[in-house]
């Protein structure tokens, strides 16, 4: 029989191997370590010693158990005829433990039914050898993996013989099966937020994440609300508000600000509330407008000379297109060329670069077309107007007539009860200039023009050029803040750092305040007139914004729409870019203008109308070209010619100018261009016939028809029909046309040729090959 090792015995009795070794030494049995084996005699002695100790420890507990149950009987023990059977633990009832530790452990186990073991009966009737064998088997049954009833989930019946391993496995499986698994509690959904913030749009998944809900739940709600959406589909503002309203959650849309948009900084300046104590009075910015030869340039020259006589010695060369004039310790800023592109571009963008407009009207000429145009420009910009009645020194001057004519355009003099200031002057002789300057200062005081000099500068570009020695040079007008040397700046689509600044006197300055013109260098490229500039905190930010704006401008330039002309009008209409044709009419007399306009308005082709945006009498000037470029219009001139400046501007702006001397030709040209929108009509034309006289089959080529041209001619690029007994059997194109072995472009009547037809080899002798072309016919 096998022997038991020390550690196995210790494990069965739930004691340490050290205590077992000490107990064996007390019995006089020497063991080396926990791996040593214990023979049967030593094992019997050790069991007797352990039983004696356990009985002393269990005696009080057993009495307590008997008293509690009201039973005076002792513990239930099987009848033993042999003293050696007292140490046989499996012969006791399965529910009773042999040691306190085991008893405590078995108390939590499920109670089992006590059954007599067949092995015990066999052991009682057997000899000493069988009893010893039973003792050994029972000891093995208490080892780990056996069917010991003292272990949780174990089998209460004693094991039989050598089947204890299988019993142990079954017992463990039963323990696992009997163990009840509690399902995990599903997590509680988070509480809905009080408010969510979004910008532009959200997908269903993003909205579900913000609401702490599953996307499937939102998809169901959206479907019930009439919105069909998938998990990755973007929801607009209405759908987001709809679903959040259903949940009772507030919605707030966050508007993202494009930091590369310079207009945002100007809007913030207008909207932000500034401490009045930080604002200081700034000089007014004045521009001069009027009709040709009414004295605008003379007035500017006179004002320059006045500046020289007032404070400067000698003649001063003007370096930039704007200058300042000081009178009564107050400054006035004048734009040198009020009609140039900078003013037009700024007015179109709504930029309030100028504060006051001086309208120059000749006293001997009165109100002219450009005068009316200047009035409309000033009103569109919302600027106050001061009327300077010039040339009062001439004998035929009549200022009252000028006042009377201007009342028709809501410019009523103060002397007549209106609110428009009229200042009679003589720019040539310098009369009335000081009074005009005083009126400008008076209007500026009424307007309360103020700015904050303690902020970073913003403003607009008056003009710019590329200087050979200094590189890109830009003339800026500071509208608010203070511009310093070294400031990182973004000007339109360019950027840089201000290296040098030169004022209108040609002197270098270190800083300039509001309403001051200055010429700067240090940009990476030449900006456009009318661009805005903004000073930033650091050069890195300015560079990033400038490069982003430049790249966007390049993309926009590549995808820009070409100007409309009569030649490409149909392409624009077909692409859906236009639904009407904008036209500017200029003629020699008003009657021709009205007749031409009335005739053009009657043209209606496929729902596309002619829209006349401007009519006037006189030559085509630069203002007409500017308007045509802004509105994508075509300029029609009747008995008039464009000026040299207008022709140059038209070339630069790609504006189409059409000149006519006969009115119906102008009408026909516009109508013909509009009819180009209709699909062209084609008509078939038979150009020749050929009779097939012989066919030759060639591998990799197909069937070659040897033909004789009986009528007209056969061309290489014509379409053909194969006619057999008067029936068309195939229609296609010629693949090859040869005369002898050479390729031919065409074969005339009376000549022989070889023809192969694309995708057709079933050519028979006596077939007729008919050649035709499609010709476009003119619409009527």
Curated annotation (Swiss-Prot):
Keywords: Cytoplasm, GTP-binding, Initiation factor, Nucleotide-binding, Protein biosynthesis. It is found in: Cytoplasm. GTP binds at residues 290-297, 336-340, 390-393. This is Translation initiation factor IF-2. One of its GO terms (cellular component) is cytosol. The lineage of its organism: Bacteria, Bacillati, Bacillota, Bacilli, Bacillales. One of the essential components for the initiation of protein synthesis. Protects formylmethionyl-tRNA from spontaneous hydrolysis and promotes its binding to the 30S ribosomal subunits. Also involved in the hydrolysis of GTP during the formation of the 70S ribosomal complex. Disulfide bonds: none annotated. Residues 290-297 are annotated as: G1. Residues 53-65 have a biased composition (Basic and acidic residues). Residues 281-450 form the tr-type G domain. Transmembrane segments: none annotated. Gene3D superfamilies: 1.10.10.2480, P-loop containing nucleotide triphosphate hydrolases (3.40.50.300), Translation factors (2.40.30.10), Translation initiation factor IF- 2, domain 3 (3.40.50.10050). Residues 315-319 are annotated as: G2. One of its GO terms (molecular function) is GTP binding. It comes from Listeria welshimeri serovar 6b (strain ATCC 35897 / DSM 20650 / CCUG 15529 / CIP 8149 / NCTC 11857 / SLCC 5334 / V8). It comes from the Bacteria. Belongs to the TRAFAC class translation factor GTPase superfamily. Classic translation factor GTPase family. IF-2 subfamily. Residues 390-393 are annotated as: G4.
């Amino acid at each position: 029989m096998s022997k038991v090792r020390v550690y196995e015995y210790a494990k069965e009795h739930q004691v340490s191997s050290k205590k077992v070794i000490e107990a064996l030494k007390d019995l006089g049995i020497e063991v080396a370590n926990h791996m040593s084996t214990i023979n049967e005699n030593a094992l019997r002695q050790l069991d007797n010693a352990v039983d004696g100790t356990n009985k002393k420890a269990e005696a009080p507990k057993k009495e307590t158990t008997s008293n509690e149950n009201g039973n005076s009987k002792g513990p239930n023990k099987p009848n033993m005829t042999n003293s050696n059977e007292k140490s046989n633990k499996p012969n006791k009832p399965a529910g009773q433990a042999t040691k306190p530790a085991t008893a405590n452990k078995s108390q939590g186990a499920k109670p089992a039914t006590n059954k007599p073991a067949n092995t015990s009966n066999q052991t009682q009737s057997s000899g000493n050898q069988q009893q010893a064998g039973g003792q050994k088997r029972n000891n093995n049954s208490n080892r780990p993996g056996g069917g010991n009833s003292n272990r949780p989930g174990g089998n209460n019946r004693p094991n039989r013989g050598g089947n204890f391993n299988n019993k142990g496995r079954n017992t463990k499986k039963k323990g696992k099966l009997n163990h009840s698994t509690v399902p995990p509690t599903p997590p509680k959904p988070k509480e809905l937020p009080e408010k969510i913030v979004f910008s532009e749009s959200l997908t269903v998944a993003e909205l579900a994440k913000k609401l702490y809900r599953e996307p499937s739940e939102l998809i169901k709600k959206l479907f019930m609300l009439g919105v069909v959406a998938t998990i990755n589909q973007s929801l607009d503002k209405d759908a987001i508000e709809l679903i959040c309203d259903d949940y009772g959650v507030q919605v707030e849309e966050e508007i993202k600000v494009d930091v590369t948009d310079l207009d945002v900084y100007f809007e913030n300046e207008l909207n932000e509330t500034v401490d009045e104590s930080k604002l200081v009075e700034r000089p007014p910015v004045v521009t001069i407008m009027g009709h040709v030869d009414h004295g605008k340039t003379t007035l500017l020259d006179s004002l320059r000379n006045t500046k020289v006589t007032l404070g400067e010695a000698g003649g001063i060369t003007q370096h930039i297109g704007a200058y300042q004039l000081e009178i009564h310790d107050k400054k006035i800023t004048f734009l040198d060329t009020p009609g140039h592109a900078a003013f037009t571009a700024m007015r179109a963008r709504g930029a309030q670069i100028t504060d006051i407009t001086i309208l120059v009207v000749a006293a001997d000429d009165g109100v002219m077309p450009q005068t009316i145009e200047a009035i409309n420009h000033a009103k569109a910009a919302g600027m106050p107007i001061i009327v300077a009645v010039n040339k009062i020194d001439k004998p035929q001057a009549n200022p009252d007539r000028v006042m009377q004519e201007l009342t028709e355009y809501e410019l009523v003099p103060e002397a007549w009860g209106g609110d428009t200031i009229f200042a009679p002057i003589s720019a040539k002789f310098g009369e009335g200039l000081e009074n005009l300057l005083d009126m400008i200062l008076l209007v500026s005081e009424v307007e309360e023009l103020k700015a904050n000099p303690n902020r970073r500068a913003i403003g607009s570009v008056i003009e710019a050029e590329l200087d050979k020695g200094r590189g890109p040079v830009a003339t800026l007008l500071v509208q608010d803040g203070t511009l310093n040397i070294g400031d990182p700046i973004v000007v339109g689509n360019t950027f840089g750092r201000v290296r040098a600044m030169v004022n209108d006197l040609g002197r270098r300055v270190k800083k300039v305040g509001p309403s001051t013109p200055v010429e700067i260098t240090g940009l990476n490229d030449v900006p456009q007139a009318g661009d805005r500039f903004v000073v930033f905190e650091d050069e890195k930010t300015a560079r990033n914004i400038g490069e982003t704006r430049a790249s966007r401008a390049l993309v926009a330039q590549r995808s820009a729409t070409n100007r409309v002309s009569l030649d490409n009008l149909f392409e624009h209409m077909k692409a859906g870019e236009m639904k009407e044709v904008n036209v500017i009419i200029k003629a020699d007399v008003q009657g021709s203008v009205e007749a031409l306009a009335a005739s053009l308005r009657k043209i209606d082709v496929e729902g596309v109308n002619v829209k006349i945006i401007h009519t006037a009498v006189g030559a085509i000037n630069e203002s007409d070209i500017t308007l045509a470029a802004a509105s994508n219009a075509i300029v029609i001139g009747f008995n008039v010619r464009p000026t040299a400046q207008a022709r140059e501007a038209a070339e630069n702006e790609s504006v189409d100018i059409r000149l006519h001397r006969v009115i119906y030709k102008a009408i026909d040209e516009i109508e013909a261009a509009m009819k180009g929108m209709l699909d062209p009509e084609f008509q078939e034309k038979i150009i020749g016939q050929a009779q097939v006289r012989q066919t030759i089959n060639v591998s990799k080529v197909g069937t070659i028809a040897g033909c004789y041209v009986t009528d007209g001619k056969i061309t290489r690029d014509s379409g053909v029909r194969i006619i057999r007994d008067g029936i068309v059997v195939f229609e296609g194109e010629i693949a090859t046309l040869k005369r002898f072995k050479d390729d031919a472009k065409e074969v005339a009547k009376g000549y022989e040729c070889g023809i192969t037809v694309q995708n057709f080899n079933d050519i028979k002798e006596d077939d007729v090959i008919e050649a035709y072309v499609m010709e476009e016919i003119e619409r009527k």
